Amino acid sequence: MAAPGSCALWSYCGRGWSRAMRGCQLLGLRSSWPGDLLSARLLSQEKRAAETHFGFETVSEEEKGGKVYQVFESVAKKYDVMNDMMSLGIHRVWKDLLLWKMHPLPGTQLLDVAGGTGDIAFRFLNYVQSQHQRKQKRQLRAQQNLSWEEIAKEYQNEEDSLGGSRVVVCDINKEMLKVGKQKALAQGYRAGLAWVLGDAEELPFDDDKFDIYTIAFGIRNVTHIDQALQEAHRVLKPGGRFLCLEFSQVNNPLISRLYDLYSFQVIPVLGEVIAGDWKSYQYLVESIRRFPSQEEFKDMIEDAGFHKVTYESLTSGIVAIHSGFKL
């Protein structure tokens, strides 16, 4: 398996070689390389450029998409239970912190990508509903002389308990969306919520549509992370915010060793016992190790056009929240 650096080098050399050959053709020069050998070299470089990783395995870009889909199709029904078991429930705190950092205002239009089971969407709806109710109470206290009829009229004018806020959950996996919809019905979430089947690399939304874009524990599964970031930038309104909660690199050597031991020796076993799927959770562990560091991912977000990009490491760097703005 080629190292990441060597793949990048081959990709760079391939681009340089192609430019050189085009230059020779424009000048009317002929290559001294035998035709068959030259063609084989270029084809080999193109093949390498189209390869990516699926955990620790090297696969074609096209193959990765199908493999990732199968992983989440397989684990969808046990996804939330496994999140609780693997993280000992700490993932709930991380997601609460994401909402605290988001601090959505009334009327916020949120796009939650790779949010199939609805964890972020439900937290958002709870948050904005609570904020709106507090606003209503403040307004009523300021109008204590109103009659009961006038108070009832005020409430009728405020039928939208979310204050105009909306969330769209977008996921590429039908099974994950199915689980999310079932949870929404069971927990009574109906208003201000929409479910859309879509690809993070090619979002089915117009430009400048959303105030906030979130993606939690999803972007490392995308084949072209740079393309997903560019799509996030495209669909956000000017002034909109990008927020990503994702596994990252542990910054404490002792905790890192313990984390590796737990990840590789315990998590796949839990996956087999609870979800009946060792391989999917082996991929999960490996995909975390292949994801860029906090600083590297920060650079990628900036390259996509975002400004004021920052990140906060949580639980010694096991996860990080990255934030950026579209200006």
From Swiss-Prot:
Compartments annotated for it: namely:
Mitochondrion inner membrane
Q: According to its UniProt record, which reaction does this protein catalyse? A: 2-methoxy-6-(all-trans-decaprenyl)benzene-1,4-diol + S-adenosyl-L-methionine = 5-methoxy-2-methyl-3-(all-trans-decaprenyl)benzene-1,4-diol + S-adenosyl-L-homocysteine + H(+)
Q: Which PANTHER family match?
A: 2-METHOXY-6-POLYPRENYL-1,4-BENZOQUINOL METHYLASE, MITOCHONDRIAL, METHYLTRANSFERASE
Q: Which CDD domains match?
A: AdoMet_MTases
Q: Which gene encodes it?
A: COQ5
Summarize the protein's role. Methyltransferase required for the conversion of 2-decaprenyl-6-methoxy-1,4-benzoquinol (DDMQH2) to 2-decaprenyl-3-methyl-6-methoxy-1,4-benzoquinol (DMQH2).
This protein's membrane topology, according to the annotation, is:
Peripheral membrane protein
Pathway given in the UniProt record: Cofactor biosynthesis; ubiquinone biosynthesis
The organism's lineage?
Answer: Eukaryota, Metazoa, Chordata, Craniata, Vertebrata
Q: Which disease is it linked to?
A: Coenzyme Q10 deficiency, primary, 9: A form of coenzyme Q10 deficiency, an autosomal recessive disorder with variable manifestations consistent with 5 major phenotypes. The phenotypes include an encephalomyopathic form with seizures and ataxia; a multisystem infantile form with encephalopathy, cardiomyopathy and renal failure; a predominantly cerebellar form with ataxia and cerebellar atrophy; Leigh syndrome with growth retardation; and an isolated myopathic form. COQ10D9 patients show cerebellar ataxia with cerebellar atrophy.
* EC code: 2.1.1.201
**Name of one Pfam family that matches:** Ubie_methyltran
> One MF term in GO for this entry?
2-methoxy-6-polyprenyl-1,4-benzoquinol methyltransferase activity
Q: Which GO biological process entries does UniProt record here?
A: methylation; ubiquinone biosynthetic process
Keywords, comma-separated and alphabetical: Membrane, Methyltransferase, Mitochondrion, Mitochondrion inner membrane, Primary mitochondrial disease, S-adenosyl-L-methionine, Transferase, Transit peptide, Ubiquinone biosynthesis
Q: What class of enzyme is it?
A: transferase
Q: How does it assemble?
A: Component of a multi-subunit COQ enzyme complex, composed of at least COQ3, COQ4, COQ5, COQ6, COQ7 and COQ9. Interacts with PYURF; the interaction is direct, stabilizes COQ5 protein and associates PYURF with COQ enzyme complex.
Q: Which species does the entry assign this protein to? A: Homo sapiens
Chain positions recorded as S-adenosyl-L-methionine binding sites: T117, D171, D199, A200
The Swiss-Prot or TrEMBL record describes its family as follows:
Belongs to the class I-like SAM-binding methyltransferase superfamily. MenG/UbiE family.
What InterPro entries is this protein classified in? SAM-dependent_MTases_sf (IPR029063), UbiE/COQ5_MeTrFase (IPR004033), UbiE/COQ5_MeTrFase_CS (IPR023576)
Any GO CC annotation of this UniProt entry: protein-containing complex
User: Which PROSITE patterns does the record associate with it?
Assistant: SAM_MT_UBIE, UBIE_1, UBIE_2
Superkingdom of source:
Eukaryota
Q: Where is the transit peptide?
A: 1-42
The name under which this protein is listed is: 2-methoxy-6-polyprenyl-1,4-benzoquinol methylase, mitochondrial
